[in-house]
Amino acid sequence: MQTLAENLTSQAISPTLEKLILTLANTSKEISHAVRHGALAGVLGATEQENVQGETQKKLDIITNDMLKDALKADGTVRGIASEEEDYVVEADANGEFLVCFDPLDGSSNIDINSLVGTIFSVLPAPAGELTEKSFLQAGHNQVAAGYVLYGPSTMLALTTGQGVQLFTLNPETNQFLLTNAAMAVSKDTGEFAINMSNQRFWEAPMQTYISDLLLGKIGPREKSFNMRWIAAMVGDVHRVLCRGGIFTYPTDNKNPEKPYKLRLMYEANPMAFLVEQAGGKASTGYETIMDIEPTAIHQRVAVILGSANEVDACLEYHGIDYSEEPAL
């Protein structure tokens, strides 16, 4: 089996991007070790701190954030860092070519119950000049790499550099990521959907109607039975979509009118959209393609609908948009 390093060389990407991806991968091995040790290392439970989103930070949120931040600052290829756990952007190397946005431990509320968690990352080109928040405000189409590491029964890395999506599995005996799927592909159709049903009464009318029709199954307008899945960690739900198709959505809701969206654009929606589109799926807010969004803040939130192309199209029809037709040239 090809190692991650061998695979990156075969992709003919720049040596600096290759170095950065290997740094992210190597740090994820350390995070995997910390996650596995859990209560044995005294790293479970919450702190008394909150992040910029007002969410209570788990001990491992802070530990994993510091691990990634320290590794990227020392890498030499990174100009700046944006993290879910940092209020502001963090400067790294003044000569760095890249900006890295990451969620160090997605699904951290699952940690204390020994369920799935992961790391999500996005790599952008660093513009010339002084590093500010504005440096990061680039549309998702500018990403040069994106991926996630899933800490489950196996530790897996899903990666794209714009040349499809490759899946690597960490060999615990050699501590190397080995290529186990050279071309992940999202099926066009699906019979599975993932959504937090407890928020149903707060959704917009198009999403309410769409989900209601799925639940009606064969006796409804879709004339097909669907199963619901929900892991409560985006990284786990998107991994399932990449492996066997499906649609994952965290839609607009009015539960808190000041925060109508849950997921963050820069380090959750954009990297996952890049992966899903590279695997043949689609990713939208319901009203626009996620990677077309021009960001206004590093912690900006958006609605997310992504997964199997035909099912995303079906959902978008409920929102009054038909993306199934290719634009005329």
Curated annotation (Swiss-Prot):
Binds 2 magnesium ions per subunit. GO terms for cellular component: cytosol. It is found in: Cytoplasm. One of its GO terms (biological process) is gluconeogenesis. It comes from the Bacteria. Its cofactor is Mg(2+). One of its GO terms (molecular function) is fructose 1,6-bisphosphate 1-phosphatase activity. Its EC number is 3.1.3.11. Mg(2+) 2 binds at residues 103, 106, 268. Mg(2+) 1 binds at residues 84, 103, 105. Substrate binds at residues 106-109, 196, 262. Its main location: cytoplasm. Signal peptide: none annotated. It catalyses: beta-D-fructose 1,6-bisphosphate + H2O = beta-D-fructose 6-phosphate + phosphate. Pathway: Carbohydrate biosynthesis; gluconeogenesis. Keywords: Carbohydrate metabolism, Cytoplasm, Hydrolase, Magnesium, Metal-binding. InterPro entries: FBPase_C_dom (IPR044015), FBPase_class-1 (IPR000146), FBPase_N (IPR033391), FBPtase (IPR028343). It holds the Pfam family FBPase. The keyword Metal-binding applies. Belongs to the FBPase class 1 family. Homotetramer. This is Fructose-1,6-bisphosphatase class 1. It comes from Shewanella halifaxensis (strain HAW-EB4).
